[in-house]
Structure formats: structure tokens, C-alpha cells
Design a protein with these regions (language model features):
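Terminal amphipathic alpha-helical/low-complexity segments used for targeting or macromolecular assembly
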Residues: 1-44, 48-49, 66
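Structural signal for interior beta-strand "rungs" in well-ordered beta-sheet cores
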Residues: 37-208
Length: 208
């Protein structure tokens, strides 16, 4: 799923799940590419009333109005779509590259993310790590890991040692130490998972 500023859960679902409609997917990708080219810039941008303190590297990032960046380690090649009504907070020790963060998001406390889309009012904190993943509105992620997941609205994974791989979720509550995987070790990746809306995984559960 290509990420861009206006990506919605509905559009991402169509692109991810309707690959048997190649003409539709090709046209959607063309529209996304056209929008992306219109937004493309050789320079980063810092909007009005932005607060940046004790921060390491910021390179090729578009920062929206009223964003707060405090103690962040590294931000590279991304967009932070903050605004006055819903400012974005990027806190201590965050490392992010190839990302888009939507309005009202809160990312702090050592989060590491790469090639991710973070939706409106999402909270990622407490050493959570993610790559190649989509998080849509009001997701909350702490402590665990995510790899190539489609986290629909209100997906929650707050416990330590939780691992979500190659799955699609919404209104999920992942238990402590739960593992949703797409491979059996030596066999390598074999499929992707779809967990029904509103599911709850128990502690130390394993779903293949």
C-alpha cells in the first residue's frame, strides 16, 4: 500500500485486498502518484508555531503548524501533518524514517519506526518498534513490535513481548506476549492473517 498524506483506512483496504481488480488498483496508484508529485519538494519545511527542542537530526521532513518535537533522536524523509486544532507531539528518543504522521498523533519514549503511516490521534510510546506498517485513527501501541501490519482504527497492543506480523486488525486488544505470525520459522513467510474486528488475544497466545 503506497502511503501519502490523504491515505484513509478505506482506501488502504481496497488497495490491499482488491488486487484481483488490477485496473482499479492501477488507477488508484496513478492518482496517488500524481498527488505525491505535486507535494514533492527538494527542501524540508517547518510550519508556524512549531516547537523544536534538544533534537538530533531532522532531514527532509515537512513539519506542520503547532507541532512539538522534544528530545527526538532522528527524523528523516517524512511528513508530520500537524495543525492548530490537532497538534502532533514527537517526544524523546524517537527514531523515524520514511514516514507520515497524521494530525493529533503522539509518538514518544524511544519509538523506532520505518516506512510507516501513523493515522490521526494514534499513540505510539514506550519503546514500540514498527516497520512497513499502517496505523489508522486512534490506535495505541506500546512496548511490543509490529512488522507489515494493517492496523485499522482502535487497534491496541500495549503489553511487552507482543509481536504482530503480516496481519490485518481493527478494534484488536493484543494480550501480553501474544504473537500473530505469518511463518513457522524455517518455512519462511507463507501467508498473511486477518483477525476479525474486535478480537482479543490472550497472554502468550500464538496465532499462525
Amino acid at each position: 500500500v503506497p502511503i501519502y498524506n490523504r491515505l484513509s483506512a478505506q482506501l488502504a483496504y481496497i488497495i490491499a485486498m482488491y488486487r484481483h481488480r488490477p485496473d482499479l488498483i492501477a488507477r488508484l496508484r496513478e492518482m496517488i502518484e500524481a498527488y505525491s508529485l505535486a507535494q514533492k519538494s527538494c527542501y524540508g519545511k517547518i510550519g508556524n508555531s512549531v516547537h523544536i527542542v534538544n533534537t538530533g537530526t531532522i532531514r527532509n521532513v515537512c513539519i506542520g503548524d503547532y507541532c512539538q518535537i522534544d528530545g527526538t533522536s532522528r527524523l528523516e524523509n517524512g511528513s508530520i501533518n500537524s495543525n492548530r486544532e490537532a497538534p502532533v507531539y514527537i517526544g524523546p528518543n524517537v527514531t523515524a524514517e520514511d514516514f507520515i504522521v497524521s494530525s493529533g498523533a503522539h509518538i514518544s519514549d524511544g519509538v523506532v519506526m520505518s516506512r510507516c503511516f501513523i493515522g490521526q490521534a494514534c499513540h505510539l510510546t514506550h519503546l514500540f518498534s514498527a516497520h512497513d506498517s499502517l496505523f489508522f485513527s486512534n490506535c495505541q501501541s506500546e512496548n511490543g513490535e509490529a512488522c507489515a501490519i494493517f492496523a485499522g482504527p482502535y487497534t491496541v497492543t500495549m503489553h511487552k513481548s507482543s509481536l504482530l506480523i503480516a496481519g490485518m486488525f481493527s478494534f484488536l486488544n493484543a494480550g501480553s506476549g501474544s504473537n500473530q505470525s505469518n511463518h513457522m520459522y524455517k518455512l519462511g513467510p507463507i501467508h498473511q492473517g486477518v483477525v476479525e474486528r474486535g478480537s482479543k488475544t490472550t497472554s502468550d497466545s500464538y496465532i499462525l
